[in-house]
């Protein structure tokens, strides 16, 4: 578990992408500044996690949840981020729900298709069996004649 900023290294590619998205086009950032932002982000993540963990512990839980993080943001005096975070959380939940429903529908469609294929296979087997019975009966009739 990361307890110090040095223990937590956020991926440089992610930090660089976030920085580029936040800055206007044509603005460059030095390697030293990028490193400082990365360290600051690490400190923020550790601090936010620690505060959120306090809320989870008050609730006698070992698992942090979204409400713990939102409460931590308010406690850290980042209230202005709570509303956008809630909106992002709701969007995430809707997306997950949509994915789950799509997955369930895909499974139902596959099960239905499998069932139809099994029914078709059984029908073909029954038809083959009937044909064989007819052929045997015809052969028996020919032998009798």
Swiss-Prot record:
Keywords: Acetylation, Coiled coil, DNA-binding, Nucleus, Phosphoprotein. Residues 93-145 are annotated as: Disordered. It holds the Pfam family CBFD_NFYB_HMF. InterPro entries: CBFA_NFYB_domain, DNA_Pol-Epsilon_Subunit, Histone-fold. Residues 85-144 form a coiled coil. GO terms for cellular component: ATAC complex; CHRAC; epsilon DNA polymerase complex; pericentric heterochromatin. The modification Phosphoserine is found at residue 121. It comes from the Eukaryota. It is found in: Nucleus. PANTHER family: DNA POLYMERASE EPSILON SUBUNIT 3. This is DNA polymerase epsilon subunit 3. It comes from Rattus norvegicus (Rat).
């Amino acid at each position: 578990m990361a307890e110090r900023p040095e223990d937590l290294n956020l991926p440089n590619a992610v930090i660089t992408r976030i920085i580029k998205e936040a800055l206007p086009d044509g603005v460059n950032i030095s390697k030293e500044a990028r490193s400082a932002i990365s360290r600051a982000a690490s400190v923020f993540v550790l601090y936010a996690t620690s505060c959120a963990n306090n809320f989870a512990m008050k609730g006698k839980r070992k698992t942090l949840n979204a409400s713990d993080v939102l409460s931590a943001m308010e406690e850290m005096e980042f209230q202005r981020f709570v509303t956008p975070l809630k909106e992002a959380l709701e969007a995430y939940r809707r997306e997950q729900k949509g994915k789950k429903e799509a997955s369930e529908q895909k499974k139902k469609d596959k099960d239905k298709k499998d069932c139809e294929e099994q029914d078709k296979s059984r029908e073909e087997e029954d038809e083959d069996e009937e044909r064989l019975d007819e052929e045997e009966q015809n052969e028996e009739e020919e032998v009798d004649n």
